[in-house]
Swiss-Prot record:
GO terms for molecular function: GTP binding; GTPase activity; guanosine tetraphosphate binding; translation initiation factor activity. The gene is infB. GO terms for cellular component: cytosol. The keyword Acetylation does not apply. This is Translation initiation factor IF-2. Transmembrane segments: none annotated. It comes from Buchnera aphidicola subsp. Schizaphis graminum (strain Sg). Keywords: Cytoplasm, GTP-binding, Initiation factor, Nucleotide-binding, Protein biosynthesis. Residues 376-383 are annotated as: G1. Residues 476-479 are annotated as: G4. Its main location: cytoplasm.
């Protein structure tokens, strides 16, 4: 065979000459670039390269990556996700002859660490001398291991002591080599001892079995992982695929490895799945409907989109949006149509529960004092009568001598206790008076002997009859000379008020509030009537009552005058009053005296409410303040919903109102009053003043003084501020003076109404009337270079004035309306001409005059209008 040059060999092997020379030097062959290589050297080179590429023929390497996400809390309170990747590499080896032959031939590697191995052998020999038994066992085990390994390597059966030491040295060197680990040799020696005792094969069968099972498990995990990623890749771009949901749910699985320290065990993977999964079928829910509900809220209760509900509504013939309010029955139909179970609840269920959970006492009714309402016309002496009974001077403190709000007084007389309600007499307080009738037992109708039956007297009779309340007629001012009692009795018979003397059921009492005459007879009549009515009430347990009056005190807060109807009202009780609630802090009577409790038919002032309640609201004592707050909030929201529903209700009438809404003027007013009753009365009276042309718009109202907020509102909306028994504070006065706002104070309601009426009159659109002042007949027509056509006319009626508008009549039909351009008699310009005279008339921008036309001259006058 011919030798081959290194250059040709390098080209065949596709490596550089320098790398080839370096590789030859590693197998103890020194060559240069120009040298040749023999066949044997080439074979050795190829064997070496093959052994270098595959140092172990039976080597199995596994690589594995595990990815997971770790949530880390940051100082800002947010979660930060950290991606973690764990990489594992495992190598499996099998000992055989072909693996160890190149190692034994490599002399350079064995000689480098020969000295260290000799030292270790000396140490082992010295230890073996100490105990002979241990030496024998150690020598036997070492000999067996070495012999068996050497049998496989060299296929020789006999080794001497030097060869045994060499094999030990080579094995130790092999341990230090990168291909074998100390751990592997140690396990091999231990397993060989076990197999020697059991006389089995030297292969580590159990160890291999464990490894194989673990490898199979790893292969299954890797296979599942590859399939999972393959499925994700296949379905990633399919947007509307049904399997996307399953893949997404798989993505949500988090793989976590639990690592145990110092435990030689395979890491176990745990799969944590997300709790929520999209339902595959429709879920039927229990939908609770309390009352009226919007489409959006109904959709939220059914856990579906609002568009689905609207689609179902359209299929049922109902058109609406997400803000459309559905009543309870309609919402029930829609929910049941969509397959849900509906649970209906009453709107006032919470209120009913809180009312049931009340201590009503022993249910023993006792006789109570009668509640008497004094009613009648203005200035007929109602307050003076009550004054005399109470022996106080209340009337002098009333503005203008007229009662402005309901006064409740508990009077103890020699004949018994009576509670009086003094309602205002004039028509503005109709609402207050009607509330007074609802809580009263007896009505005392005061009629002035010198004035007779008046409109408010008739109204009082109507209120009393509607409430089925007995009426006692008190004819006042009998001390006056011009009194006519029989005429009053006759007038009252028209309204079915008959005295007992005339065979009727009504008691008539003649009194004089000034002198006190007949007052005792009136009290006797009241108590007699109360005995007939058998007035009784429960005086124990939680109290109930009615708000007679309410106002805001600057130092004490909201104050309500409450008439107790049954039960015992005590300090510290939790009360529910309309939209308001609170705990009673102070109880006072009409004289300002502090009370600890109040029984039936007792009027008291209550402090401690959240806000000022409306007059006429029912007061109820409850147990739980939290529940009382919930009920008050529910009532407020319900009232707001009703108002919004009424505003949104479209009708033909509202449509026409919207069309004509710009055809009227508007008077904007801000009202501040001292008490709630007066505020309501003024508001209702002002609304009654509204007409089709002028509307009263109360943009703000309240109880208490005029504040800076009120002044700012008046400035922004160009409104008038009306103060009834209140004044403006310093900050409000500053804005009012600076902006020149209209602020007016009143103490009598009549003055307020009259001035508002005058202001509304000024807002009325003016009316105009046309008066015909003269007629002229066209007798001839002339042409003028300056004015065009000139009509020669004869004044047949009235006066023709130059500056007034005119109409041209032809056959009694108006053909033109305009104005005069010139008026002359002969050649002189004149301003007017009287009946029976001739004149020349030039008409502006009109040239179609005919002989026989009539020129009508008129004037426009403005007519003053009143409400």
């Amino acid at each position: 065979m011919v030798d081959i040059s290194l250059k040709i060999l390098s080209n065949e092997m596709k490596i550089s000459i320098k790398e080839l020379i370096k590789t030859l030097s590693e197998i103890s062959i020194s060559k240069t670039e120009n040298d040749c290589i023999s066949i044997t050297e080439k074979k050795n080179l190829l064997k070496y390269l093959e052994s270098k590429k595959k140092p172990f023929l039976n080597t199995f390497i596994l690589q594995r990556k595990t990815r997971s996400t770790l949530n880390v809390f940051t100082p800002g309170g947010k979660n930060k996700s950290v991606q973690i990747e764990i990489r594992k590499k495992r190598m499996y080896l099998k000992n055989n002859k072909s693996e160890l032959e190149p190692l034994l031939k490599n002399k350079n590697l064995l000689q480098n660490k020969e000295k260290n191995n000799l030292k270790s052998l000396k140490n082992t020999i010295s230890k073996a001398k100490e105990s002979q038994k241990n030496i024998d066992i150690l020598e036997e085990s070492k000999a067996n291991i070495n012999f068996k390994n050497l049998n496989k390597l060299t296929k020789s059966n006999v080794f001497n002591k030097n060869e045994k030491n060499k094999s030990l040295k080579k094995n130790i060197n092999f341990n230090n080599h990168s291909f074998y680990s100390k751990k592997t040799i140690k396990n091999n020696t231990e397993n060989q001892k076990l197999y020697k005792e059991e006389k089995k094969d030297y292969h580590l069968t159990t160890f291999i079995h464990n490894r194989n099972t673990e490898d199979n498990r790893d292969r299954e995990i890797e296979k599942n992982k590859r399939n999972f990623h393959r499925n994700i890749k296949n379905y990633r771009q399919k947007k509307n695929n049904k399997q996307n949901n399953q893949i997404k749910s798989k993505k949500d699985e988090v793989r976590i490895s639990k690592n145990r320290k110092n435990v030689k065990q395979k890491n176990k993977s745990i799969l944590l799945q997300q709790v929520f999964k999209k339902p595959e079928s429709v879920i039927n829910r229990d939908v609770v409907i309390n009352g009226a509900i919007t489409v959006c809220d109904l959709a939220n209760k059914m856990a579906i989109k609002s568009s689905e509900v609207i689609k179902n509504m359209m299929n049922m013939g109902i058109i609406g949006t997400i803000n459309h309010v559905l009543d309870q029955d309609t919402a029930q139909l829609i929910a049941e149509e969509m397959g849900h179970k509906v649970i209906l609840r009453r709107e006032n269920e919470l209120e009913e529960l809180i009312m049931k959970d009340r201590d009503t006492g022993n249910n023993i009714s006792l006789t109570r004092a009668p509640v008497v309402t004094i009613m009648g016309h203005v200035d007929h002496g109602k307050t003076s009568l009550l004054d005399y009974i109470r022996s106080t001077k209340v009337a002098s403190s009333e503005a203008g001598g007229i009662t402005q709000n309901i006064g409740a007084y508990h009077v103890t007389t020699d004949f018994g206790s009576v509670t009086f309600l003094d309602t205002p007499g004039h028509s503005a307080f109709t609402g207050m008076r009607s509330r007074g009738v609802k809580i009263t037992d007896i009505v005392v109708l005061v009629v002035a002997a010198d004035d007779g039956v008046k409109p408010q007297t008739i109204e009082a009779i109507q209120h009393a009859k509607e409430a089925n309340v007995p009426i006692i007629v008190a004819i006042n001012k009998i001390d006056k000379v011009d009194s006519n009692i029989d005429q009053i009795k006759n007038d009252l018979t028209k309204y079915n008020i008959l005295s007992e003397e005339w065979g009727g059921e009504n008691i008539f009492v003649l009194i004089s509030a000034k002198t006190g005459k007949g007052i005792d007879n009136l009290l006797n009549a009241i108590l007699l009537q109360s005995e007939i009515l058998e007035l009784k009430a429960i005086s124990t347990g939680m109290a109930e009552g009615v708000v007679i009056e309410s106002f805001l005190d600057k130092g004490r807060g909201p104050i309500a005058t409450v008439l107790v109807q049954k039960g015992n009202l005590k300090k510290g009780d939790i009360i529910l009053c309309g939209f308001e609630y609170g705990r009673i802090k102070v109880l006072r009577n009409e004289n300002g005296k502090t009370l600890k409790h109040a029984g039936p038919s007792m009027p008291v002032e209550v402090l401690g409410l959240s806000k000022v309640p409306f007059s006429g609201e029912k007061v109820t004592v409850v147990r739980d303040e939290k529940k009382a707050k919930e009920v008050a909030s529910y009532r407020k929201n319900k009232s707001r919903e009703i108002k919004l529903a009424n505003q949104n209700r479209s009708s033909l009438e509202n449509m026409f109102k919207n069309i004509k809404k710009n055809d009227f003027s508007e008077l904007k007013i801000i009202i501040k009053s001292d008490v709630q009753g007066s505020l309501e009365a003024i508001s209702s009276a002002l609304f009654k003043l509204s007409t089709n042309e002028v509307k009263v718009n109360i943009i703000g109202s309240g109880i208490g003084g005029i504040t800076e907020t009120d002044a700012s509102l008046a400035l922004a909306s160009n409104a008038i501020i009306l103060g009834f028994n209140v004044r403006a504070d310093a900050s409000a006065k500053k804005i009012i003076d600076l902006e020149n706002l209209d602020l007016r104070y009143y103490s009598v309601i009549y003055d307020l109404l009259n001035e508002v009426k005058a202001a509304m009159t000024g807002l009325l659109s003016p009316q105009y009337k046309q008066n015909i002042i003269g007629l002229a007949e066209v007798r001839n027509i002339f042409k003028s270079p300056k004015f065009g056509l000139i009509a020669g006319c004869m004044v047949t009626e009235g006066i023709i004035k130059r500056n007034n508008p005119i109409r041209i009549l032809r056959n009694n039909v108006v053909v033109y309306e305009g104005e005069l351009e010139s008026l002359r008699r002969f050649k002189e310009d004149i301003n007017e001409i009287r009946n029976g005279m001739e004149c020349g008339i030039g008409i502006k921008n009109y040239h179609d005059l005919n002989i026989g036309d009539v020129i009508e001259v008129f004037e426009v006058k403005e007519i003053k209008r009143i409400l």
